[in-house]
From Swiss-Prot:
The lineage of its organism: Bacteria, Bacillati, Bacillota, Bacilli, Bacillales. It comes from the Bacteria. It comes from Bacillus subtilis (strain 168). It is found in: Cytoplasm. This is Farnesyl diphosphate synthase. The keyword Metal-binding applies. InterPro entries: Isoprenoid_synthase_dom_sf, Polyprenyl_synt, Polyprenyl_synt_CS, Prenyl_diphosphate_synthase. It catalyses: isopentenyl diphosphate + (2E)-geranyl diphosphate = (2E,6E)-farnesyl diphosphate + diphosphate. GO terms for biological process: isoprenoid biosynthetic process.
């Protein structure tokens, strides 16, 4: 990473993490529920999703202030999905980001409800915590985009399709369809949300939608690669869990080298799409490289 990207990520990450805690601390709820929600929100992580929202605003030369609550909303949804993914009825993981998973600390029932709370409260950040400069129409568009990305047409539907694909061989087309919904759509929302807040032209938004699909699939391919050759200490969870759970992955379908080539193809296409837009490209190019080369 260049000094520019390192500085950008470090400065904004602190802001995002602080605001996630502030938003949640202010909510009126049972103490046990608040502790469970904060436990997972404060467990670390890349904060890549909110940082993408801010990076797109930055690329258009616009203020990042309204990107913070919108980015935090996405991070809350991402965190809820991790809590639920780790449950015994799903992936049955005991470790997340180097710490015991939420249900191991607070019990399954509280973990489920903490996830429910994070999902529900996330939308309030968009409707009530952005500035008055963001019109009601724009807020509604953001909410609708987020519902499509996180709900049955996106992440939730993708998770079900992923579960149904276990213990059987799927085609590459099926695998990409699963991860387009399970992973790429929520990452894609971050790109689109930044563009909407920046008042980007509709033509740009459609190009960015395709761009986000490529980085989303690329992100998943890198995840699959790390599950084979990553460091458990850096990843913060068990390595090899995809194989243990008999999941189809890009390396299992294409070989490890084939998956790395596929990742390279997606990242190059994402950069090509950005190259045709009238915005500051350097930061987005570097984010593409970060997605392709990350070690956790």
């Amino acid at each position: 990473m260049t000094n520019k990207l390192t500085s950008f990520l470090a400065d904004r990450k602190k802001t995002i993490e602080n605001q996630l805690s502030v938003y949640t601390e202010k909510l009126d709820m049972p103490d046990s529920l608040k502790k469970s929600m904060l436990y997972s929100l404060q467990a670390g992580g890349k904060r890549l999703r909110p940082l993408i929202v801010l990076a797109v605003l930055n690329a258009y030369g616009k203020s990042e202030k309204d990107g913070i609550p919108v980015g935090c909303a996405v991070e809350m949804i991402h965190t809820y999905s991790l809590i639920h993914d780790d449950l015994p009825c799903m992936d049955d993981d005991d470790l997340r980001r180097g710490k015991p998973t939420n249900h191991k600390v607070f019990g399954e029932a509280t973990a489920v409800l903490a996830g429910d709370g994070l999902l529900t409260e996330s939308f309030k950040l968009i409707t009530s915590h952005v500035s008055d400069e963001v019109s009601a129409e724009k807020r509604l568009r953001l909410v609708n985009e987020l519902i499509s990305a996180a709900g049955t047409e996106g992440m939730v539907g993708g998770q079900v399709a992923d579960m149904e694909a276990e213990n059987r061989q799927v085609t590459l087309e099926e695998l990409e369809s699963i991860h387009e919904r399970k992973t790429a759509k929520l990452l894609g929302f971050c790109v689109i949300a930044g563009a909407i807040l920046a008042d980007a032209p509709e033509e740009d938004i459609e190009t960015l939608r395709t761009f986000s699909s490529h980085i989303g699939i690329g992100f998943q391919i890198r995840d699959d690669i790390l599950d084979l050759e990553g460091s458990e200490e850096k990843i913060g969870k068990r390595v090899g869990s995809d194989t243990t759970n008999d999941k189809s992955t890009y390396p299992s379908l294409l070989s490890l080298e084939g998956a790395k080539h596929k990742l390279d193809v997606h990242i190059k296409e994402a950069k090509r799409l950005i190259g045709g837009l009238s915005l500051q490209k350097d930061l987005l190019y570097e984010l593409c490289d970060l997605i392709a080369a990350r070690d956790h």
